[in-house]
Amino acid sequence: MLEKIIELTNEYIESMPKKERKKYGQFFTSMETARFMSGLYNFDEKTGKVSVLDAGAGSGILSCAFIERLETIDSIQEIELTCYENDENVLPLLKRNLEYCKEETKKKLTVNIVEDNYILSQYLDFNHMLGGNAEPKKYDFVIGNPPYMKIPKDAPEATAMPEVCYGAPNLYFIFASMGLFNLCENGEMVYILSLIHI
């Protein structure tokens, strides 16, 4: 399953100039890294249903690797996958790839693609503000390869999370912080982060 997703992603990369991808801090996960990351999770053999969040899903490589891993666990029969992606260039590929995963998996896979800014769409919830959701959605598993870029300290994403932003913030650190917020108690999160800047 993952091989096909990687093949389609490589076609996208060849068609999209690096300058355009860099504008979004867009770097795609390799097949080996995606499988390694999905292999880090521990699954309760008694669980029949899991919820998964992939924020900044890109082409869906990490989601697909995670689904592929769940294929090996008989007890898990139902997967609820939420993917955030707001890059209009990659969204058609993400939709195509996740549709392919739905066709290939033997599990009941429910996919929700949120075409919104992952951070800004939840800042009211994160900051416990009026208008926010008092009980925001939490996930059993969070996986991610967030955008790699520094943002100005007055960028909307930085001002949306003042609790975690000091100085010149990195967007990937903000994504990881929101990922922890989205994680349910006893949940697990695996992210690719640059330790040099944290």
Regions found by a protein language model. Name each.
Residues 196-198:
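Conserved small/polar residues in nucleotide/adenosyl-binding loops
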Residues 160-184:
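Glycine-rich S-adenosyl-L-methionine
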Residues 1-75, 82-101, 122, 146:
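Class I S-adenosyl-L-methionine
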Residues 152-156:
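Conserved ATPase-coupling elements of RecA-like P-loop NTPase cores
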Residues 187:
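Glycine-centered, small-residue-biased loops immediately flanking beta-strands
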Residues 98-130:
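S-adenosyl-L-methionine
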Residues 142-149:
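Amphipathic alpha-helical repeat scaffolds
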Residues 126-141:
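A short acidic, Gly/Pro-enriched loop at the edge of an enzyme's catalytic core
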